[in-house]
Amino acid sequence: MTEPILQIRDLSVYYNQKKTLKDVSLDLYPNEITALIGPSGSGKSTLLRSINRMNDLNPEVTITGSIVYNGHNIYSPRTDTVDLRKEIGMVFQQPNPFPMSIYENVVYGLHLKGIRDKSILDHAVESSLKGASIWNEVKDRLHDSAVGLSGGQQQRVCIARVLATSPRIILLDEPTSALDPISAGKIEETLLLLKKDYTLAIVTRSMQQASRLSDRTGFFLEGDLLECGPTKAMFMNPKRKETEDYISGKFG
């Protein structure tokens, strides 16, 4: 059996001493898409932000448990969070390109690493934009502002910006919820292509999207991971009544 690339064990997250994520254990596997589903406020995004330590930015957050990546607990004091976020990239719900050119957006992370060689940067821009399935749309206007692109194009540039740092895991927090159906479809096609080379975890409110994209699904309710397993099995024969009710739209 394939070994997980990342192991979450007994992870709890407290906001102002209120336990919002409760003893969650979950594995992410190489070259798979894991969907995180559940009602608003169930802990999905909190878990995602814990995986690359984005929750560190909130001083009111306390975390217990462990997340093991590359054989080390990422919450160890010796973890370099800058390096961690290069290997575990994040794409947010709202497209958030920087107010600079498409080219500069993509190489932003490489500049932070001190890379200035134009040939390396040019290659990274082309390969990353191709990986995000947007190269053909922007290759003749790389020095135009990324803010002038459509919402779907902006989101794919944000994906390219993540790819440029050579991550192993990509986290996506409702990446299509702010987009029209055609743009959302292009993002989904891109994610299925990326699965060949990366591990992905996606928070989604769309059961159809989870069913189309993911290999595994985790269902969250009030901070608990109630059920997790292969997506087809969960959608066809959920083990928990709460899972069945949520998937069938009885609440949410």
From Swiss-Prot:
Q: Does the keyword Plastid apply?
A: no
**What is an annotated GO biological process for this record, any one?**
phosphate ion transmembrane transport
Give the species: Streptococcus pyogenes serotype M6 (strain ATCC BAA-946 / MGAS10394)
Write down a Pfam family by its short name. Answer: ABC_tran
Enzyme class, first EC level, given as a word:
translocase
The record's subcellular location field reads:
Cell membrane
Its recorded reaction(s) are: phosphate(out) + ATP + H2O = ADP + 2 phosphate(in) + H(+)
Protein known as: Phosphate import ATP-binding protein PstB 1
